[in-house]
């Protein structure tokens, strides 16, 4: 895992967009983002048990697996959104980027690769893309039945109770 400030330059979302300014993992924790590196899936099983993740599935995001809908899906994943539950991803192969909003409403880019696990809190604005190799395989973990319901950023979603709860846990973001 490597986290850094997104450079906001034009170009393909799958490029690095590396500003050259790294972000410390402790800063991610301040935003509510948790990161682990697990070479053994048994460690993932323990985390799942400890955090009451009852369900999981595996998704492969690639042109070979998704065919003609790949580009459309990657663009959809890159729309800024939040979820009403945690987003947990354990990278089994390939690499990709999660971008999360900072307290200054800037993007922090988090590069994940094999054996990285990330937990995004409910209510955090974020987006996802593969890297320029166009391939990632990830285990998705869920507390309840598997679902992926993005709520795209806008005034209505800003008023969402899960967003408000997130803002209460991260006061620096709420004061924007």
Curated annotation (Swiss-Prot):
<feature type="binding site">
    <location>
        <position position="87"/>
    </location>
    <ligand>
        <name>Ni(2+)</name>
    </ligand>
</feature>
<dbReference type="InterPro" id="IPR011051">
    <property type="entry name" value="RmlC_Cupin_sf"/>
</dbReference>
<keyword id="KW-0539">Nucleus</keyword>
<dbReference type="GO" id="GO:0010308">
    <property type="term" value="F:acireductone dioxygenase (Ni2+-requiring) activity"/>
</dbReference>
<dbReference type="InterPro" id="IPR027496">
    <property type="entry name" value="ARD_euk"/>
</dbReference>
<protein>
    <recommendedName>
        <fullName>Acireductone dioxygenase</fullName>
        <ecNumber>1.13.11.54</ecNumber>
        <ecNumber>1.13.11.53</ecNumber>
    </recommendedName>
</protein>
<dbReference type="GO" id="GO:0005506">
    <property type="term" value="F:iron ion binding"/>
</dbReference>
<comment type="similarity">
    <text>Belongs to the acireductone dioxygenase (ARD) family.</text>
</comment>
<keyword id="KW-0486">Methionine biosynthesis</keyword>
<dbReference type="GO" id="GO:0010309">
    <property type="term" value="F:acireductone dioxygenase [iron(II)-requiring] activity"/>
</dbReference>
<keyword id="KW-0479">Metal-binding</keyword>
<comment type="function">
    <text>Catalyzes 2 different reactions between oxygen and the acireductone 1,2-dihydroxy-3-keto-5-methylthiopentene (DHK-MTPene) depending upon the metal bound in the active site. Fe-containing acireductone dioxygenase (Fe-ARD) produces formate and 2-keto-4-methylthiobutyrate (KMTB), the alpha-ketoacid precursor of methionine in the methionine recycle pathway. Ni-containing acireductone dioxygenase (Ni-ARD) produces methylthiopropionate, carbon monoxide and formate, and does not lie on the methionine recycle pathway.</text>
</comment>
<feature type="binding site">
    <location>
        <position position="83"/>
    </location>
    <ligand>
        <name>Ni(2+)</name>
    </ligand>
</feature>
<dbReference type="GO" id="GO:0005634">
    <property type="term" value="C:nucleus"/>
</dbReference>
<comment type="pathway">
    <text>Amino-acid biosynthesis; L-methionine biosynthesis via salvage pathway; L-methionine from S-methyl-5-thio-alpha-D-ribose 1-phosphate: step 5/6.</text>
</comment>
<keyword id="KW-0533">Nickel</keyword>
<keyword id="KW-0223">Dioxygenase</keyword>
<dbReference type="InterPro" id="IPR004313">
    <property type="entry name" value="ARD"/>
</dbReference>
<dbReference type="GO" id="GO:0016151">
    <property type="term" value="F:nickel cation binding"/>
</dbReference>
<keyword id="KW-0408">Iron</keyword>
<feature type="binding site">
    <location>
        <position position="126"/>
    </location>
    <ligand>
        <name>Ni(2+)</name>
    </ligand>
</feature>
<dbReference type="GO" id="GO:0005737">
    <property type="term" value="C:cytoplasm"/>
</dbReference>
<feature type="binding site">
    <location>
        <position position="83"/>
    </location>
    <ligand>
        <name>Fe(2+)</name>
    </ligand>
</feature>
<feature type="binding site">
    <location>
        <position position="87"/>
    </location>
    <ligand>
        <name>Fe(2+)</name>
    </ligand>
</feature>
<feature type="binding site">
    <location>
        <position position="81"/>
    </location>
    <ligand>
        <name>Ni(2+)</name>
    </ligand>
</feature>
<dbReference type="Pfam" id="PF03079">
    <property type="entry name" value="ARD"/>
</dbReference>
<feature type="binding site">
    <location>
        <position position="126"/>
    </location>
    <ligand>
        <name>Fe(2+)</name>
    </ligand>
</feature>
<dbReference type="InterPro" id="IPR014710">
    <property type="entry name" value="RmlC-like_jellyroll"/>
</dbReference>
<keyword id="KW-0028">Amino-acid biosynthesis</keyword>
<keyword id="KW-0963">Cytoplasm</keyword>
<dbReference type="GO" id="GO:0006555">
    <property type="term" value="P:methionine metabolic process"/>
</dbReference>
<feature type="binding site">
    <location>
        <position position="81"/>
    </location>
    <ligand>
        <name>Fe(2+)</name>
    </ligand>
</feature>
<keyword id="KW-0560">Oxidoreductase</keyword>
<dbReference type="GO" id="GO:0019509">
    <property type="term" value="P:L-methionine salvage from methylthioadenosine"/>
</dbReference>
């Amino acid at each position: 895992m490597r986290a850094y400030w997104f450079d906001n330059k034009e170009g393909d979302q799958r490029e690095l967009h590396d500003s050259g300014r790294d972000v410390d993992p402790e800063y991610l924790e301040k935003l509510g983002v948790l990161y682990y590196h697990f070479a053994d899936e048994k460690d993932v099983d323990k985390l799942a048990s400890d955090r009451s993740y009852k369900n999981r599935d595996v998704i492969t995001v690639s042109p070979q697996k998704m065919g003609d809908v790949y580009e459309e899906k990657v663009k959809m994943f890159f729309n800024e959104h939040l979820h009403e539950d945690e987003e947990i991803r354990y990278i089994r192969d390939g690499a990709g980027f999660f971008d999360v909003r900072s307290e200054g409403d800037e993007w922090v880019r988090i590069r994940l690769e094999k054996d990285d696990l990330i937990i995004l809190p409910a209510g955090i604005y974020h987006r996802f893309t593969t890297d320029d190799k166009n391939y990632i395989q990830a285990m998705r973990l869920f507390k309840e039945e598997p679902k992926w319901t993005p709520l795209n950023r806008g005034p209505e979603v800003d008023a969402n109770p899960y967003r408000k709860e997130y803002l209460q846990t991260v006061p620096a973001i709420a004061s924007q």
